[in-house]
Regions:
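Carboxylate-rich, polar loop motifs that coordinate divalent cations or form catalytic acidic clusters
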Residues: 1-289
Length: 289
C-alpha cells in the first residue's frame, strides 16, 4: 500500500487513484482489485516527495517532486525508458527551481509548472519562466501590513535562506516570497492563475500580470489552493478564508459561514454542486442554494 502516511496529492490517473506522498513516492490504487502499485526513486522518480500529478492530453504523465519534474512519455509508467527528469540543471535554468508544487495544462497542450522559484512553461520541447521581477506576486510594500504569518522560514531552513538572499529579501523577516507558487490553475480561456506565499493571487494572460491581494478583496495573501468549479468560477483558498471570484470581485466564506478553519488547503465540487473544503484540522461540506 502507501509507503508514507503523509499525503500531498490525491487524484485520478485513468481509472486508478493516484496518491503523491511525503517521502513515500507515488502510489496508484486500482479500485476494482484494491491492488496498489508504487513508484519511487528506483523506478525513475526524481524524488520521494510528490506534490502533484498531471496526465496531459497527449498521454504524457507529469509528476511534480522536490527534485525536479518527471515526464513519462505516453504515460507508460512501467517502461523505465519513457521516464525523463527535468531539473534546473538539465533545462539550463528553464525550470527556475527544482521544488515543483503544481502542474496544469493550457489550452494548446502546454504544461505549466508552479515552483518555489517562479512559474515555468514547457511547450513543444522549449522552456520559459517568469518570476517576481517579471510580474509574479505583489511587491512587499503592498502586502506587508497584511502578512499574518510572522515566523520567517529562512531562520530555520538554509534552503529558504538562500532563496531570500537571491531575491534580495534579507531584511524581510516574515513569511513572504512572491516567487514561491503554492497553487496553480489554468482556466478555459487559457488564463494562468498562481497563488503565492504572501504575495497574493497572480493572473497571467500570456503577456501581462495582474495581482490580487487583501487590498483588492482577498481574505489573505497566502494562497494555498485554487479550484475551478464546473461553472468555471475560480475559488481561492487562503490563510484567512475561502474566496469565490466572480466578475473580478471576491465573495468571502469563513468559519462564520461554515468552514471548519479559515486556513483552506483543498477543495472539490461534487456532482450535485456541493462544496467540500479541506482546511487545517477538518473538512466542511457546504450545500449551495
Amino acid at each position: 500500500g502507501l509507503l508514507s502516511n503523509g499525503v500531498f496529492h490525491v487524484g485520478k490517473l485513468g481509472e486508478r487513484i493516484v496518491v503523491g506522498t511525503y517521502g513515500g513516492g507515488m502510489s496508484l490504487l486500482d479500485p476494482k482489485t484494491q491492488q496498489w502499485e508504487t513508484y519511487n526513486i528506483p523506478e525513475g522518480l526524481g524524488d520521494a516527495f510528490v506534490y502533484d500529478v498531471l496526465k496531459a492530453k497527449n498521454g504524457d504523465v507529469w509528476i511534480a517532486t522536490w527534485s525536479g519534474v518527471n515526464r513519462v512519455r505516453g504515460g507508460d509508467l512501467k517502461d523505465r525508458s519513457k521516464w525523463e527528469l527535468h531539473t534546473v540543471g538539465s533545462t539550463q535554468g528553464g525550470l527556475p527551481n527544482d521544488w515543483v508544487y503544481g502542474l496544469a495544462e493550457g489550452r494548446n497542450g502546454e504544461v505549466w509548472l508552479a515552483t518555489e522559484g517562479g512559474l515555468a512553461q514547457f511547450n513543444n520541447g522549449k522552456w520559459q519562466n517568469w518570476n517576481h521581477a517579471k510580474g509574479l506576486g505583489a511587491p512587499y510594500e503592498r502586502v506587508k501590513d497584511h502578512i499574518q504569518y510572522k515566523n520567517d522560514p529562512s531562520k530555520v531552513s538554509q534552503h529558504h535562506a538562500k532563496q531570500k538572499q537571491e531575491m534580495g529579501l534579507e531584511k524581510v523577516d516574515v513569511a513572504y516570497n512572491p516567487n514561491y507558487i503554492v497553487s496553480l490553475a489554468v482556466d478555459a480561456q487559457g488564463i494562468v492563475w498562481a497563488g503565492t506565499w504572501g504575495g497574493g493571487l497572480s493572473r497571467f494572460d500570456g503577456k501581462a500580470w495582474t495581482q490580487y491581494t487583501v487590498t483588492e478583496g482577498l481574505p489573505g495573501n497566502h494562497v494555498f489552493m485554487l479550484h475551478l468549479d464546473p461553472k468555471g468560477l475560480l475559488w481561492v483558498g487562503t490563510n484567512n478564508g475561502l474566496a469565490k471570484m466572480k466578475d473580478g470581485k471576491f465573495e468571502i466564506l469563513t468559519t462564520q459561514d461554515g468552514l471548519f478553519n479559515n486556513a483552506v488547503f483543498s477543495m472539490t465540487t461534487a456532482r450535485d454542486g456541493t462544496l467540500w473544503v479541506g482546511s487545517f484540522g477538518g473538512v466542511a461540506r457546504i450545500k449551495r442554494s
